[in-house]
Each structure stands twice: as structure tokens, then as C-alpha cells.
Amino acid sequence: MALAGLCALLACCWGPAAVLATAAGDVDPSKELECKLKSITVSALPFLRENDLSIMHSPSASEPKLLFSVRNDFPGEMVVVDDLENTELPYFVLEISGNTEDIPLVRWRQQWLENGTLLFHIHHQDGAPSLPGQDPTEEPQHESAEEELRILHISVMGGMIALLLSILCLVMILYTRRRWCKRRRVPQPQKSASAEAANEIHYIPSVLIGGHGRESLRNARVQGHNSSGTLSIRETPILDGYEYDITDLRHHLQRECMNGGEDFASQVTRTLDSLQGCNEKSGMDLTPGSDNAKLSLMNKYKDNIIATSPVDSNHQQATLLSHTSSSQRKRINNKARAGSAFLNPEGDSGTEAENDPQLTFYTDPSRSRRRSRVGSPRSPVNKTTLTLISITSCVIGLVCSSHVNCPLVVKITLHVPEHLIADGSRFILLEGSQLDASDWLNPAQVVLFSQQNSSGPWAMDLCARRLLDPCEHQCDPETGRREHRAAGECLCYEGYMKDPVHKHLCIRNEWGTNQGPWPYTIFQRGFDLVLGEQPSDKIFRFTYTLGEGMWLPLSKSFVIPPAELAINPSAKCKTDMTVMEDAVEVREELMTSSSFDSLEVLLDSFGPVRDCSKDNGGCSKNFRCISDRKLDSTGCVCPSGLSPMKDSSGCYDRHIGVDCSDGFNGGCEQLCLQQMAPFPDDPTLYNILMFCGCIEDYKLGVDGRSCQLITETCPEGSDCGESRELPMNQTLFGEMFFGYNNHSKEVAAGQVLKGTFRQNNFARGLDQQLPDGLVVATVPLENQCLEEISEPTPDPDFLTGMVNFSEVSGYPVLQHWKVRSVMYHIKLNQVAISQALSNALHSLDGATSRADFVALLDQFGNHYIQEAIYGFEESCSIWYPNKQVQRRLWLEYEDISKGNSPSDESEERERDPKVLTFPEYITSLSDSGTKHMAAGVRMECHSKGRCPSSCPLCHVTSSPDTPAEPVLLEVTKAAPIYELVTNNQTQRLLQEATMSSLWCSGTGDVIEDWCRCDSTAFGADGLPTCAPLPQPVLRLSTVHEPSSTLVVLEWEHSEPPIGVQIVDYLLRQEKVTDRMDHSKVETETVLSFVDDIISGAKSPCAMPSQVPDKQLTTISLIIRCLEPDTIYMFTLWGVDNTGRRSRPSDVIVKTPCPVVDDVKAQEIADKIYNLFNGYTSGKEQQTAYNTLLDLGSPTLHRVLYHYNQHYESFGEFTWRCEDELGPRKAGLILSQLGDLSSWCNGLLQEPKISLRRSSLKYLGCRYSEIKPYGLDWAELSRDLRKTCEEQTLSIPYNDYGDSKEI
């Protein structure tokens, strides 16, 4: 019944709404109430055309042109975007959001004010009269009718909401009253013993009387004008033969009502009966003989049993009627007060009736107090109550959500050309709305006002107008008003102060105390915010917004973010370090003012790390206290030469003894002892010496850690335990047990592997016993002795540095000769760590610094040898003054060796297998005194081991009685030393130290393909120095000698796979003016290989000849436009991606003398003789003068030489010129002879000067953009094919005397 009433109530609520909607027309109500967004574009063209359109096309477009006054009476932000070209017209974009009924209320108007201001006002429909230029939005035709219906609709719905809320509050009040009322049981009426014996009281559980039954019972009682009382018991009693006093019961019920319904509150829930009050109870008809009440109770019980119990209804009805018909007394018609009739009309009261529907009659009065779970005060809310509350809340929410008006918001976006808005423009916004200048790249100095409503006063917003210099931390508008400032004052957070130059920025001035290690020890890779690289020049301290305290940018464009930041720190850091194309110098002055020249200066600004004046600064044992703040120091450091113990309780020498605090008792089997050893030079400092010991009756083993019983006897008197480890440095093939450095290709000093001789290990041809696990393979004799001789090449040492090049002799030549005898292949099968390495590793664990691991690698190497070859090797290097000498000696050697060497079939070959080697021939020339054949020839020889007697090619022979001692020739297979470590943590740290030692000089960590340098590995310029930058060696080309105007330079491109990324090479060219002092230069030119040479920017005088590819790493460069007979100095640097430069490499060379065509000079000499012979006319004189004047100094020298050689009998050249041309003209011609140096003058007097030409290929590149940070050197040759084409250049040379054989 209650749910039906609720449904009817909802129907009443929604009914008028539907009628109103229908009366308004055939319009969908949901469409009328939905939120919509409408965008309108408003152009300023009409007003600019009517007034002064010429301001948009002014030549000085960079200056502000127009004053704006924009006012918005609606809530919504104002956005200014200067994204238009200077020739485009400004326009407004209005984004109106709200109900469809509210959007037409928005009006706007544009007006040109007298002071030249463009006014744009957004206002309400009724907020301003209709003015010219006022544009309305679209309005529906029946707006007034809809407005009235909307008001009526809202009124009806408001009444429904209030009614529903009242019902809900009433239910909650009654529920609260029932919960806090104390339950009380009414005393049962007394009855006689005869009635107790003759009749039996049957109790029907109240849960069996469902909601429909109780409702019908109530209706029957009301219709019959009869009332019945209620007993405050859980079950409804049916009294058979019960006699009672009606007056007493009536008084009891009246007391119950006057007591506030305590028994009423003890029922399960509330019912609609409770709304009838106590008047109904007091008006009940309790007169005996009320048959209507009796029949109503029987019908009620019948209906309830049929609805809730599967028991046969006929049987139940018969049982009940037998009781009612046999009784002649009056019974009280009781109605259960359970609230399930209202809360659960379907009959589900939430009790055990569903689980146990069988009807039970109780005859024991004490059992009638069975309680229902629904009526338990611990669970007062059942499913029905929750359902009612949910339905009510849902209906209220539905009604409210369907009638909540969308707020009317108007967002204005002003699109203008750059610099169009003039300073002094004003914007008036509602309070709470903001001006968005994020897309306003060049904001003007505008004035902002805020107003509470469209008619309220304007208040100047001093903080919001700070568009050009927004406050970094916070803004105080009140201070600006009090001091009459144009903008609000910027304030800084606690611990910060204003920058002295930029008042709107803040710098930190309080850093607090830090006792302990410097908290920012991790240097992450720095990133250029544009290119993503790692250069740096200075160190700064700034804060970032992740709460970590500080970060250390290393330059204004390169930052080092902490580990928590992403690769692009500008997206998350509140700094002015952002470097963009349009904002490079955002905070340069501020950074300069707060910069530090070095990391030490930065750390000193934070004060001392500890107070060492008392109690050693809190440092324990033999730690020294230092107050200087270091990046990786806690203020407690160990004395020099000592390392901290694993528990940091003291310092010890890790090279001596053990560490008792390592958690493993120092590796000692029994005792680990400590002893204080003072320093001899400073008694205040001492070393904690730790060593192993044994208890009584035990002695220390040979390993210094194990203990053995003193009484223990060993067989045959030998030592107990493992066999003693022997040093392997005096053993054959002993290098196999030592460490190896795979970079330097040298054997380390420390023994890595244990060598024992417990097994009889011998090899064929060797008398000595070999260590255990060593496998030796002997190479056959016919494959042992091999000779190698290289092709003669220019001496590389001559081609670099100070090059004493002579165009007469050319390059000196170097040739290598080598004989190698590989005798044994050695392999190590068994690997066991030596005691020395074991002791060193045992002192290292996760708490040890990288420096300790690097020291171990320096001692034991980074690899251990697995396979190697042994034998004998002899090498000789032979230098020749030029290639002609080498050619003559080699041809002579071939003739001699072929003529004097015995044939393979002769008996002499068998008797004396010795053959003549080329080094022996060179030695014989020196010994025989044939100086003219060996002038300028020298030879140096080196040997490894002793030459075996089976090899006839050895230059230095040894006595046949001396046994051959094979030496280590080459390590063919090696493994990292960290693979020998079993502890995972120690192995990982040793591997990291190995990588750091190989690529980062031991002062940085390898991160992917780059080195993260330690704080101590930064140079004076602030650049990292841990990854050594390879030095390119600049040299003259080995193929093309310098000419009079051209030099070919080359170098090898070398880039390690980790730590360094070469991005460019810089070449400096200087002209030396003083031949004795090369520091005096006249001109200087610096060229970038990437930007100037291969890009084609300066290709006329510098051209690439060869670039690297996948096979070759040589870079060859052609330098043209040089002056003959001039000293030039070329300097080369390599540049990596951090901006570092490698150590320079120099080449100082003098260009050859000017090239002359001797054939042409002789022809000119013949021509001059013919002109001067006999009578010389004026025309012939002028021809001779013009010819000689245009020759130039070198050719004039050769003309003079040939003229005097052939025609001196008719007069010397100088005299003939003066006689034929006159002194003045002859002086002008002969003055050119002094332009050359004495060296070139001497060369031009050679009787024979030949001219030859050499072809040189080069790359002619047209201009293109080369990105150095994305340069792939291995693919450079392929990439340049797109912009460069191969061309040929002809180079002239002079050969003085006999022609060279190049």
C-alpha cells in the first residue's frame, strides 16, 4: 500500500510536467533542457573599414597600432592569440555554452571610441539598450510563452521535491525515535486455573501475518467501527476461554500511548498505523462479543497462511475455525504492530518465515518471546528500508538533474596580428575569470579589471596583468594597491630571495644544514633541450619542483635532471632553463649572477659539513674529520692509504690483512684479530691491522686463514691440506696465469690463476714439467718459420709535426721486415683463482668504492688468458732517404740473392740451409764500406725470444747449444676477469669497474654508450673529462706530396664505441711570417669539417678528397689557395657531442717553390734572342718588353738561364735587355728576379727541370644542411653521394735533376 502511494505520488509529480510540456507544443523536453555550445566568429572589419583601415598596412608593422577595450559581463575566460599575419584583420571568436533558452540572451556590440579604441562588449539581453553595432543571437518566435511554461514547470517540480523531502525526513525521524526508545513488555492479564487447564493459548507468529493480511484486518476493523487492543509481545495470542478485565486493559493501552509508545517502538519497523496516533487506540472497541473483529482475524490469518506457507490451506482453516466455533467467550482482536505492511507489502518481512514456512503453535508462555531478526535493534535497517531510501533518492536526483540549469559561460578568443595590441589596452572580466596569455607570444602591457556583476564597480587586477614578467612564486595584489604600483608585487617562498636584477624571479638563499654525504651525488646525463645532447660550461644551483631540493644545470642550455625527471626536463621543471628557438636568452642574466666557476665553489657556498673542533666531529675510531664540504664525503674520511671497513667503523689497509667486519669473519676459520698500528710520521693517526688467528692447539694454515691441529701428522712429512701455490713468473708459459689488459695488449703484474704441479704434465720437445690444466700443441717445423716484408711507404713520423719536406728528394721511405716462428699453441683448461686475487676479492663487496675495484684491475688486469701462441719473432725497420734509393737497393738485393743462393736440388743447400735475408744485405753494405749505395739508409731490429735452429731466416743467429725459449707472441683468446667471481654483487661491481676502466678512465659509470662522469672528472671549463677523447694525428698525405699551391692532409677517424661521440673536426690554417719563429703568424682561418667543408659552404679552397666508409677510416682533405715557398701551420682538433676538443695535432710544412714550365721558358728565350738579334724596331722592343714583363719571377729565371746557356756569346741577358729596352724598362723586368728566396733561386739554376702532372680526385659538394649530432661516419661516403660528385684535379710538380720514380 505504501509503495502504491509512492507510485501515485510520483505520478502526480510527473503528470503536471508532462501536461506542461505537451501544452508548450510538440517539443521534446529533453532537448529544451540540454546544454549546448555555440561558436560565433565576429570580425572587426566593419569598424576598421569605417574608421582607419590603413593602420593594418603600415610599413612599421612591428609597433603597436590599436587600443582594445574588451568587456565580458558573463563568466568565462579571455584568450589572446597573436597568430595572424600583419596583413590580416583581427577577429573575435565567442564560445557560448548554456541552455538553449539562455544562449539567445547573449548580445555583443562593437564601437569605435573617440580616443581611437575599439570597444567590444559582451552583455545580457536586458543589460544594455539597443545600440548601433549591437548584434543579437537568434530568438525563437514564441519565447514569452515558453518562458511562462518554464516558470510554471519549475514551480511544480520544486513543490514535488519539497514533498518528497518531507516524507523522507518524517521516515527518518520515526526511525530514529524507534531506535532510541527502550522496549517494554506489557504485563499479561491473569486468568483462572480452570481456563488454563481447559483451554490452551495458541500463538501465531507475527511474521506469519503478512502485509496484505494486516491491511485487510485494519480495513475490516475500520469498516466495522470496532477497535481492538495491542499487546506488546512478539507473537499475536489467540486466547481461548480467556477472561479479563476490559477496564484494566483499556487503562494499560492509554498509559502506553501517553508514555510515548515505548512498546510501540519495540516492534520491527514503522507502519502506517503509527500515523493514526494514540487516539485510534484509545477509541478501540474492547467490548466482549465483537464478532466482526473475530472473523476479521480469522480471515487475516487465512490470507496470510495462504500467501506465505506451503501447508494445506484447508487444514489450516479447519484448525482455526474449530477454535473460534468452540469458544463462547469474547476475544480481543489483536493486530501485529510489525512495520512490514508498509515496508514490505509482498509479505517478506525478512524473518525465518521464508526458510521455515511451517506453522508452529506455542503453548509455553515463556517460549512466546522468540525474537525476529527484523526487530533486532542491532540491525534496524532491512532491505525494504534501503529500497525505499534508494527509490526516494533516485527520484529526487532525477528531478534535480533534469532541472539544474547549465551555467551560461561565454569564452572570448581574440585573434590579432603580432604587436597589434597597444600598451594600455584594457580587459574587463567577471570576478573569477582569467586572461589566458599562454598563446600570446608577444604580450602588451595591458590593464585588467574585474567586476562582481555587470553593474558592479571595476577593480583593477594587479596580479593578472603581469603578462610580461609573471611572478615565479606568488603575487601580492594588496601591496601593489597600497603603494600605487602598476602591478602586484612578487613575493618569494621561505628560503628564497628576490633576484637583484629580475624582481619577479626568486633565487634560493637558505640551504639548511647537511651533516652527512652530499645528497646530490648522482650525475644524470645532461640534455640539450633542443638537440638532446650533453655539453656544459658552468655549474649552477637551481631548484626544481619535485621536492628533491636542487638540481645542477651545467649550462644555460644544458641541464642535468635528477633520476626522477623525464628526458625532457623543461616539461616538468619550473625553471627558466628552457631553450627554444624564440626564447634562447630567457634567463641568461639571472644564471650568470648565480653561477659558480667550479663545483668546489658551489659546495663551499653551503658551509662546513661538520664541526671538527670537538669530539673529532662525531667521527669514529681512526677516521679523520674534515669540515670542507665535498660532493662524496660525509665529513669523516680515512687517512691517506687507508680504506673504510665494511661496517664503516674504522679504516684499514685493504692490501694488508683482512676485514673482520665484512660479515664473514674476514674469511678466517676461527679468530679475526685487530691491532692498532700508529703511523710512523704521525702518531695521532693509526691503521687498524686485522688478521686471522687460531685457538689453542691449532696453528694457522699456509693460506693465512685456515687452522690446523698442531698434533696432526701428514704422510711422508709433507704439508697438510692443499698443495702450496707456486709463483708462475719463472715457469715456462707462466704468462697464462697472469692477468691481461686487452687495450694495451700487455700482461699484468698480478697473478690471476693458481698454478699447481700435482700432475705429471709434460709436452713433446719440452723437458720442463708443465702446470696442471695446461694443454700444449706443437706446430710442425715446416710451418714455424715465416718471413714478411712490407711495401715501402712514406715514414709516418716524418709526415706529422715539423715536416722538413724537400721537393728535390721527396718523402723518406720506411720498410718493415719480420720473421715469425710460431712454435706452440697453448690452452688453459682448468681455472682456479690465485690466493692473491682471492684475498683481494674478499676485501671487496658492495660497500667498496669503484676506485678500489679499479686499483684491483690495474694490478691484475681486466682479462685472463685462455689461449695464446708462443714462439720466436724478429722484426727490422729500414729507413731510406727517398724511394729511388730503396728501389736501387731492392733490385740489387734481388740480383744478389738469385745469383748466389743455391738451388733446392744442390747438396750445398742441404749442408748450409742459411739464406741471405734483406736485413743481412743492408748490414753487409754498411760493413763493407759501400757508402754510396747506403747513403742515408739506417736499420733497427728487435727480437722476442731466441731464434730456433730450424729457422734459417733469422737475422740475429744464436748458438746452437742454447735451448730455444719460446715467448708469448699473441693472446688469441681472453675472458673478462669478473667471470671468475662467484659473488653476484661483487661480480656486478667488478664488471661496472671494468667498463669504467676501459671507457671512462675509472672516473665514471658506463650508461648505455656514454660515460656519466664523477664530480671530480670535470675540467676547469666545466666539461666532463672522464671519457678520454682520442687525438686525431694530422699528417701529410702518403700518396700526394705538397705542391707549390696545394697541400693534401689526412688523418684517421677514431671513435670508441662507448664514451665519446665525434661530431666534427676543426682545422686551423696559419701562415707563418717568420721562418725562425713559428709563433708569428699573419693570417688564421678555422674551418669546420662538417659545417664548412662537406656542406659546400667554403669548398673553393678546402675540398674533401676521401671520407670514411665501412671499410676505410681515413679522412683526406685538400687545401688549396696557398702561396709558394711559404711556411704554413695546420692544427686539427676532434670535437665530441659535449663540446670538448681533443688534444691538437700539428703539421708545419713549407710549400715547394713555384712551378715552372722549362720547355716554355726555353721557347721564350729563343723568341727573345730573335727579337734582339740585328736591328730591333720599336714594335719588336715593345713585344719583347710585354713578353718578359708578364712571365713572372720563376719563368724569368729559367729564361735568363737558357738565354745565357745558348746565346751568351752574343751578349749576356741582362746587358741585352738594358741595351735593347733601355734602363728603365730593363730595370722593371729584372727587378722580378729578386722576388724568390735563395733556395728557390738555387733550384732554378738546375740544368734540368722537368714538369709532371698528377691527378687528384676530390668531392665537389654543393651547399646542404649537415646535422652533426646525427652524423653517421660509417655511412658518410654514401650520404655525400647525394650532394657531392667526384671530380678530378690536375696538380703540376717540378722534378729537379733526374726524374723521380714515384
From Swiss-Prot:
A cellular component term, taken from the record's GO annotations: membrane
Subcellular location as annotated: Cell membrane; Perikaryon; Endosome; Cytoplasmic vesicle, Clathrin-coated vesicle
Residues recorded with modification Phosphoserine: 227
What InterPro entries does the record point to? Annexin-like, ASTN1_2_Fn3, ASTN_1_2_N, Astrotactin, EGF-like_dom, FN3_sf, MACPF
Transmembrane intervals = 154-174, 384-402
Q: Per the UniProt entry, what are the Gene Ontology biological process annotations, in alphabetical order?
A: locomotory behavior; neuron cell-cell adhesion; neuron migration
Task: Give one Pfam hit by family name.
Answer: ASTN_1_2_N
PTM annotation (Omega-N-methylarginine): residues: 337
Got any disulfides in this one, which pairs? 463-475, 471-490, 492-506, 612-625, 619-636, 638-651, 660-672, 668-692, 694-707, 785-951, 876-941, 947-954, 1000-1011, 1013-1026, 1101-1121, 1153-1240, 1261-1284
Job description of the protein: Neuronal adhesion molecule that is required for normal migration of young postmitotic neuroblasts along glial fibers, especially in the cerebellum. Required for normal rate of migration of granule cells during brain development and for normal cerebellum development.
In Swiss-Prot or TrEMBL terms, this protein is called Astrotactin-1
Q: Which organism is it from?
A: Homo sapiens
Gene name as annotated: ASTN1
